[in-house]
C-alpha cells in the first residue's frame, strides 16, 4: 500500500494505491468515497469481463484506453453499468443538467438535487 501511514492519527487520507487487494476485501466489495485506488492485475481480458459481470451493476465503469480498441468494444457490449466513461473521471459532474443519479445497488435515481 502506498499512501499516508498516519491517516488514522491525523484524520487525513492522502491518495492511496492498494496493490493486489484480496477480492474479498472491503475495498473490493464496498463503494469507495475517497482517494483510494485498488489495483488488481488480471491474466487476460476475459477475466476482467467476468469480474465485472460477477458483481452488482456498478454505478459507473471507467475505461482508460482507446475507445476504438477491441477491449473497449467488449466492455461496451458485454457489461452493464450506470455509466461507461472513457478516459475521464469527472464526467458526471461536468454538467449539472445531466440526468444521472445511478442504477442498481448504489443508484438513487436522481442527481444534483432534482
Briefly describe each language-model feature range.
Residues 1-4, 62-64:
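Short beta-strand segments
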Residues 2-8, 89-90:
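Short, solvent-exposed loop/turn elements at beta->coil junctions and helix N-caps
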Residues 12-114:
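Conserved C-terminal structural/oligomerization subdomain of aldehyde/semialdehyde dehydrogenase
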